[in-house]
């Protein structure tokens, strides 16, 4: 268990260091090929991948990862950057200066021979044992067909390894050359004249499968040839300045000098061949870089859209909640007004003014509900809700435009990065090709046939260079017109629009119901008022009729009294007479 924890800790530290180096070297052309490794060891990439393909990871793990990533970007990374700058300034640069000052005084030729002698003896012993015990068994297993296939694979991975080794060394050299200077060339110059034949012999021929297994007789020879096929040695050989080349020529024997000339010619040939092979890698590099930039563009867009949509989703959630609260407030106001349509009229005992109560007669209402008042409530509700929904649609349109502008800005930024990368790599390749042409012009063979072949190869290489340059331009156009994935933005917009439309329809239907209910209440109240008026009118007419009858009866009674009085007077008069 302890070993497993140590292994996990070691891998975590290595991945962390790799990611930091990737971020530190992201703008360096020499380290560009390592971006694939950086990409597939980036935890953020795997977090995005698992979030897209696993709902459980997206809901449970991804939020915590985002929190940790934000804390790292805000709290940890600035501290590491500051510490790196301080360490580089305080420790690394002074250390390189001290080493450089010591290397000027150090004669490494003796130490080289001291280390080389035991290594040669060890190698002889190893190959003697190998030829005696291991080689016979391997010959039975490694057939000619298998060896041929193995050779192809080895050459393939050897070229790839050499390419990465070259760009890594260039990257390191580009970053620390201003401190160290040309110390490496000075150190190599101390013993290069002593092993000139070995250096040039390493590039005189292409190693065969038999070169991988040395015989006993070869091991017993006094003069050991360096059989390494590292193309880095070729680069070191052809990058000798004029002074070092003169020093080598002055200290070498005549036969070694002739061997140097042949080696130089072979170097040119191998450099041309290597240049032709590297064009295929260059094409693959352009394709890989294009895919990386597209993936980075899609990743940046996805990250921005995710954050923006989450933020706007919360904003619209609050807006819909506010809209719902306001609509309920308006609907409640209209409903109360509708309930108070059937009100009861009363008289204030103190002021003698009319007052109104609800239909139960227990609660006084502020005012008498009329059709004009309810119609005003409906118009106010409708206009307010329309303003709110229109404002939300306007905000949604502005958000969509903002996202599109940001996506275009991200695209332009990535295109600019690719253009800068393309300019640098084209410049580097043009320098390399011009350098090879210069080497061919000064170190080429006197044979006209060989010179014509070199010119033909140079012409083919320049055509391939032009093709690669056009490929970069086409890739740039492809990036400039690469459409972003805005499906989530469209889905979010459709969702919000659908919700707004649903709210508008529901509120319209509810207002229609309230309007119908208000009309019914008003019609009922008007009917009751008509009936009351008719009853009052009938009562008034009945009262008037009763009054008329009473008046007529009184008049008749008065006439009867007058007639009785007259008769009495007449009778009395008659009796008197």
Curated annotation (Swiss-Prot):
<keyword id="KW-0749">Sporulation</keyword>
<feature type="coiled-coil region">
    <location>
        <begin position="513"/>
        <end position="561"/>
    </location>
</feature>
<feature type="signal peptide">
    <location>
        <begin position="1"/>
        <end position="23"/>
    </location>
</feature>
<keyword id="KW-0175">Coiled coil</keyword>
<keyword id="KW-0687">Ribonucleoprotein</keyword>
<feature type="region of interest" description="Disordered">
    <location>
        <begin position="525"/>
        <end position="577"/>
    </location>
</feature>
<dbReference type="GO" id="GO:0030435">
    <property type="term" value="P:sporulation resulting in formation of a cellular spore"/>
</dbReference>
<keyword id="KW-0732">Signal</keyword>
<feature type="coiled-coil region">
    <location>
        <begin position="379"/>
        <end position="416"/>
    </location>
</feature>
<comment type="subunit">
    <text>Component of the mitochondria-localized RNase mitochondrial RNA-processing (RNase MRP) composed of one single RNA encoded by the NME1 gene and at least 31 proteins. Absent in the nucleus-localized RNase MRP (NuMRP).</text>
</comment>
<comment type="function">
    <text>Involved in spore wall assembly. May be a component of the mitochondrial RNase MRP (MtMRP), a ribonucleoprotein endoribonuclease involved in the cleaving RNA transcripts to generate primers for DNA replication in mitochondria.</text>
</comment>
<feature type="compositionally biased region" description="Low complexity">
    <location>
        <begin position="562"/>
        <end position="577"/>
    </location>
</feature>
<protein>
    <recommendedName>
        <fullName>Outer spore wall assembly protein SHE10</fullName>
    </recommendedName>
</protein>
<feature type="compositionally biased region" description="Basic and acidic residues">
    <location>
        <begin position="525"/>
        <end position="545"/>
    </location>
</feature>
<dbReference type="GO" id="GO:1990904">
    <property type="term" value="C:ribonucleoprotein complex"/>
</dbReference>
<keyword id="KW-0496">Mitochondrion</keyword>
<dbReference type="GO" id="GO:0005739">
    <property type="term" value="C:mitochondrion"/>
</dbReference>
<comment type="similarity">
    <text>Belongs to the SHE10 family.</text>
</comment>
